[in-house]
Amino acid sequence: MNKFKNIAVYGGGSFGTSLASVVARNCNNVTLFLRNETILKEILYKKTNVQYLGDIKLPTNLQATTNLSVIKDFDLIIIAVPSYAFVDAIKLLKTYGISKDNTLLVATKGFAHNPTELLSDRLNTLLPDNPIGFLSGPNLAKELAKNLHTSASIASLDIDIANKIAHNLSSKTFTTNTTIDIVTLQVAGALKNIFAIKSGIDLAREQGANSRAMLIVAALKEITTLSKVLGGMQKNSDILLEAGVVGDLVLTCYSLGSRNTKFGYEFEISMDKKKFLREYKELVEGREALKLVLDLIKKYNLHMPIVSEVASLIHCGIYI
């Protein structure tokens, strides 16, 4: 199978940098696109990104730039920005000339807003002719950067595209599986952050290991509920057993290295919850996703008790 000649990663945060490291270990021509000039110089000359990844050394062949005018020349462009910035990022890349010749791999997890919809649906409007894939898995940024073993699912409506991306990214420490179920992979990637908030709350309440295990079971049911109404799991539910769904869900819910689990835990133990929510500065994707998932629950009249419970505490309850 053919290799991509060169690969771009757009997004210089913790996940973007660590994902670029994964790709650079398997491909020679990899460039990280970012905005911060200080971090750019650090990556180029010291091969670190201390702000996001501490003193972890990045691959020596990893290049970096702030010059978006050249991104159109890359065969594969990996998008690794927060969900709230996703649509603006795609619109920006369009102004720099990306075309149907560029394959996109979306590593962002969440929904597009105004209106609330899957990222794939928004991409169908913004870039209808581009080959598109989606990546999700149990991938904590610092562990990726350290080259510790993990796995990921890669989805595309064109299985040949998914397989080509997987072929380019896979290594002994980064294994992949492929699927055409782009809907379930996206739904799981967005909802797992909400479930992780619930996991953190339960941990603070000392609910025990049994309760957290049952949370995983209930979470998979709610992923199934939303996925099916959005067009996922039309033939089977095997995708639930893959790295990008149950693997990512378990990691996010069980690790305090997860920002969402940490947020849920700290929220629950805080004495002044209004103040906590008002002053919490770290990006929590689950908190952002809540507002959007509630729109979908209302639109399709869905029963999703975990999401509704977390929303009643965090988003639409007395703590707003």
UniProtKB/Swiss-Prot annotation:
Q: Which SUPFAM superfamilies match?
A: 6-phosphogluconate dehydrogenase C-terminal domain-like, NAD(P)-binding Rossmann-fold domains
Q: Which InterPro entries match?
A: 6-PGluconate_DH-like_C_sf, 6PGD_dom2, G3P_DH_NAD-dep, G3P_DH_NAD-dep_C, G3P_DH_NAD-dep_N, NAD(P)-bd_dom_sf
Q: Which UniProt keywords apply?
A: Cytoplasm, Lipid biosynthesis, Lipid metabolism, NAD, NADP, Nucleotide-binding, Oxidoreductase, Phospholipid biosynthesis, Phospholipid metabolism
The UniProt entry's GO biological process terms, in alphabetical order, are: carbohydrate metabolic process; glycerol-3-phosphate biosynthetic process; glycerol-3-phosphate catabolic process; glycerophospholipid metabolic process; phospholipid biosynthetic process
Query: A Pfam family this protein belongs to?
Result: NAD_Gly3P_dh_N
Q: What does this protein do?
A: Catalyzes the reduction of the glycolytic intermediate dihydroxyacetone phosphate (DHAP) to sn-glycerol 3-phosphate (G3P), the key precursor for phospholipid synthesis.
Quote the protein name from its UniProt record.
Answer: Glycerol-3-phosphate dehydrogenase [NAD(P)+]
Q: Which organism is it from?
A: Rickettsia typhi (strain ATCC VR-144 / Wilmington)
